[in-house]
């Protein structure tokens, strides 16, 4: 490096004095001649330039005095603060003094100042004590938030921990904050560590470091139909200025505020909807709140419409909102007193007392009255009824054929029947087979309705009265109604073939005539066992005027009758051999069943005196041996007879078939001959037609050519004729079109001229009218007297002028201007006439 160092403006170099080992800084612009004991440590460097909005960090900065000039030691060396850092902001370019260094991060030494936007801040912490211009003293470890909008000015004593965003507090929303330590917030309120509070102001809020965000608290919207219940968590004064005790509950409605944000010292226990009662509604409130704001536990209150209210804390609704009891003319309410009270009519009601409130009226029950049920008039036809029990005496009676309303001491009594009777009543005929019964049958009968049963024609029903201990028999057709103490007599009859016990249940006994069938097994004297299928016709001999209960004396009259007849038949058959019985079975069985009279004749009927049952006829439907051998021999004989009959029928059928075949073959041969004759006739006709065709074919070609040529000429002539017609038609259409066009044009021109003339006439008329109006308006504007004066002004002036000149008249003319002597003479005559008159 040369001894002459040229230092430009804003450049510097460091020179080391080898004698004193002290480095000094030379700042341009200058030209410096290096001495022998001095050494230039580097080429001239540009001064450090910090532009606006930037800063740099200088390590080991120099010590400056109050005048901001670096301090120099005894050896003229610059004093440094070793290990320190200094942040330098925008200033004139400056050199780095010996010992000073620029702090570089990732090769960059110039840093841009950070701008803190609105609603944001920087969380910073003090690393060592210092005194700030805004803070008297800042101790190491303190933390705070630098709020925007501003430019963040860094300090070496402060480190940046991170960026903090502001919290947005929306309308009807608050944020819950908690104190990290004891401090005084921005509103000047002293906060204790752990204390929580709400920030309710809408907008952006940047919490201080001492404030910890807990959560957002959304307010409850209060309307005419919604309110909230609150409970105090601790003693405090709410936002409405009212002192609250811990555990106290209260209600906030829309009358106090449209919205409510719950404080940290209170909690929403419930959101309640308004109970709206119309004019015809009411409700019962349990534990109502009194005038002092305290629940009256154990009490109830009836609230009637029209109104709307909210249930306060501790209150509850008994049941639901109920409609006012509108009692019709044929209705009543059964009421019961819960406590002793005096009603509006002055009647004292004792606890448990019941009474009826009859309509027509409207009724809202008191809190000490219980509505047991609504009763109405039960409409009953003449064949309908109900069972009514007196709850005081226990007596049960029937009400039939008239509308009835139960009294306060009466209830509907349900009459129970056995399952058999219930199922039989559900059957149309009043009877059913045991095999067809439904095990899951459930009666749909209304039990308090009187039990009715339609007795069919020619049937009887027995009803037993347990109170009077006697039965009664009803013959059909009739309608039976049971009193409370009566029951049906159920018949259990035998059924099937052979008869089986308890196969059929019935409420009514059919009197007949009817029939029964049975199958019995008998044995002849030669030990042939036979199975007989018998049918009996029977009926009951009953006095219609006074039926006797004797017909119901035998519960299973079918089984008893069949057993009796079977016994008699077996006895009679046992005395006969098989052949004799097979030939005379009907006579033997009829004689055995009916017996003989005193004259030895077979009777016509069998009478059972126990129940007046009469069997009038017996029919043998079939007789079959039960022994296999006997059955086989009978089957063989029957089969042999069938075979003989079948063979004779087959022979007759074969003979008839052969005869029909011969007749068919004859008809077929005859038809063949007829067909051959027809074929020959058709062939002859075909040959004749073929000959005619050949003749036509021979002369057809010349005729065809002549016809074709003639037709061609005819077509050409027709074509020319049609073309001429078309041309004439076209000319005619063109001429007609031109004529119509000219006519239309002339009509339009004539119409145009006519309208133009009319317009001219209208125009002239309107101009004349306008001129007349103008003259009239001018005359009316000038005035008649004025016009007269104007008209007389000329002659008068001339007369005066002539009078002044002493002339009677005058005439001025030359040789070129003619004189109208006629007018002059007339004027003269007029003048003379005037003078004569005057």
UniProtKB/Swiss-Prot annotation:
Species of provenance: Trypanosoma brucei brucei (strain 927/4 GUTat10.1)
Protein role: Required for normal vault structure. Vaults are multi-subunit structures that may act as scaffolds for proteins involved in signal transduction. Vaults may also play a role in nucleo-cytoplasmic transport.
Pfam families in UniProt: MVP_shoulder, Vault, Vault_2, Vault_3, Vault_4
Assembly behavior: The vault ribonucleoprotein particle is a huge (400 A x 670 A) cage structure of 12.9 MDa. It consists of a dimer of half-vaults, with each half-vault comprising 39 identical major vault protein (MVP) chains, PARP4 and one or more vault RNAs (vRNAs).
MVP repeat ranges, renumbered to this chain: 13-52, 53-114, 118-170, 171-223, 224-278, 280-328, 329-381, 382-426
Source taxon at top rank: Eukaryota
Record's keyword terms, sorted: Cytoplasm, Nucleus, Phosphoprotein, Repeat, Ribonucleoprotein
Gene3D superfamilies named in the record: 2.30.30.560, 2.30.30.570, 2.30.30.620, 6.10.250.720, 6.20.380.10, Band 7 domain, Major Vault Protein repeat
GO cellular component term, pick one: nucleus
Record's protein name: Major vault protein
Lineage of the species this protein comes from: Eukaryota, Discoba, Euglenozoa, Kinetoplastea, Metakinetoplastina
Subcellular location: Cytoplasm; Nucleus
PANTHER family: MAJOR VAULT PROTEIN
């Amino acid at each position: 490096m040369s001894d002459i160092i040229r230092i430009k403006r804003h450049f510097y170099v460091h020179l080391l004095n080898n004698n004193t080992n002290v480095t000094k800084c030379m700042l341009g612009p200058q030209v410096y001649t290096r001495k022998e004991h001095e050494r230039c440590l580097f080429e001239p460097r540009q001064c450090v330039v910090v532009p606006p909005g930037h800063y740099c960090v200088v390590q080991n900065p120099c010590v400056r005095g109050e005048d901001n000039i670096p301090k120099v030691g005894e050896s003229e060396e610059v004093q440094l603060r070793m290990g320190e850092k200094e942040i330098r902001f925008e200033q004139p370019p400056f050199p780095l003094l010996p010992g000073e260094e620029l702090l570089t991060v990732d090769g960059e030494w110039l840093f841009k100042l950070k701008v803190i936007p609105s609603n944001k801040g920087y969380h910073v912490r003090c690393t060592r004590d210092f005194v700030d211009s805004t803070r008297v003293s800042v101790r190491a470890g303190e933390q705070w938030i630098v709020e925007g909008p501003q430019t963040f000015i860094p300090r070496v004593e402060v480190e940046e921990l991170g960026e903090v965003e502001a919290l947005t507090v929306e309308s009807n929303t608050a944020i819950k904050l908690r104190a990290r330590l004891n401090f005084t917030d921005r509103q000047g309120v002293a906060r204790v560590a752990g204390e929580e509070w709400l920030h309710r102001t809408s907008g952006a809020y940047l919490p201080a470091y001492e404030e910890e965000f807990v959560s957002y608290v959304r307010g409850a919207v209060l309307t005419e139909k919604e309110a909230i219940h609150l409970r105090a968590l601790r003693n405090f004064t709410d936002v409405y200025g009212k002192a609250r005790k811990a555990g106290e509950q209260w209600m906030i409605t829309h009358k106090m505020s449209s919205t409510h944000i719950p404080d940290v010292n209170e909690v929403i226990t419930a959101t309640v909807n308004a109970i709206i009662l119309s004019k015809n509604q009411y409700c019962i409130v349990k534990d109502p709140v009194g005038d002092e704001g305290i629940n009256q536990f154990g009490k109830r209150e009836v609230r009637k419409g029209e109104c709307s209210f909210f249930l306060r804390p501790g209150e509850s609704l008994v049941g639901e909102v109920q409609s006012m009891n509108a009692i019709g003319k044929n209705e009543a309410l059964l009421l019961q007193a819960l406590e002793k009270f005096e009603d509006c009519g002055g009647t004292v009601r004792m606890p448990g007392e019941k009474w009826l409130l009859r309509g027509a009226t409207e009724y809202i029950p008191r809190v000490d009255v219980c509505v047991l049920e609504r009763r109405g008039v039960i409409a009953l036809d003449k064949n309908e009824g109900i069972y009514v029990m007196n709850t005081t005496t226990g007596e049960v009676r029937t009400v039939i054929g008239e509308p009835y309303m139960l009294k306060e001491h009466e209830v509907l009594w349900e009459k129970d029947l056995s399952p058999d009777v219930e199922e039989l009543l559900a059957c149309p005929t009043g009877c059913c087979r045991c095999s067809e019964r439904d095990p899951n049958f459930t009666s749909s009968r209304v039990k308090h309705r009187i039990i009715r049963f339609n007795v069919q024609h020619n049937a009887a029903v027995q009803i037993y009265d347990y109170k009077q201990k006697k039965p009664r028999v009803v013959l059909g057709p009739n309608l039976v109604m049971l009193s409370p103490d009566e029951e049906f007599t159920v018949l259990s009859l035998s059924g099937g073939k052979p008869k089986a016990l308890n196969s059929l249940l019935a409420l009514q006994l059919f009197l007949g005539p009817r029939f029964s069938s049975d199958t019995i097994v008998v044995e002849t004297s030669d030990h042939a066992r036979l199975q007989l299928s018998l049918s009996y016709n029977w009926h009951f001999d009953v006095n219609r005027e006074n039926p006797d209960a004797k017909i119901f004396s035998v519960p299973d009259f079918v089984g008893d009758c069949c057993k009796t007849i079977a016994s008699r038949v077996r006895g009679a058959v046992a005395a006969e051999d098989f052949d004799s019985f097979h030939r005379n079975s009907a006579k033997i069985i009829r004689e055995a069943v009916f017996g003989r009279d005193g004259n030895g004749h077979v009777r016509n009927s069998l009478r059972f005196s126990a129940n007046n049952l009469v069997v009038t006829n017996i029919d043998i439907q079939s007789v079959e041996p039960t022994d296999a051998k006997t059955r086989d021999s009978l089957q063989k004989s029957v089969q042999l007879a069938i075979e003989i009959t079948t063979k004779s029928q087959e022979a007759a059928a074969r003979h008839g078939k052969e005869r029909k075949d011969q007749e068919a073959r004859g008809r077929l041969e005859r038809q063949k001959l007829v067909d051959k004759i027809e074929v020959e006739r058709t062939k002859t006709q075909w040959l004749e037609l073929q000959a005619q065709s050949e003749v036509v074919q021979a002369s057809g070609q010349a005729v065809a050519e002549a016809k074709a040529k003639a037709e061609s000429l005819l077509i050409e002539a027709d074509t020319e004729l049609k073309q001429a017609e078309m041309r004439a038609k076209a000319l005619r259409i063109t001429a007609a079109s031109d004529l119509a066009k000219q006519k239309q044009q002339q009509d339009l021109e004539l119409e145009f001229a006519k309208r133009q003339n009319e317009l001219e006439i209208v125009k002239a008329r309107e101009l004349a009218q306008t001129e007349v109006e103008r003259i009239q308006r001018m005359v009316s504007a000038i005035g008649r007297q004025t016009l007269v004066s104007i008209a007389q002004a000329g002659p008068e002036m001339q007369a005066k002028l002539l009078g002044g000149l002493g002339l009677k008249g005058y005439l001025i003319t030359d040789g070129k201007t003619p004189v109208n002597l006629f007018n002059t003479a007339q004027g003269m005559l007029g003048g003379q006439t005037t003078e004569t008159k005057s």
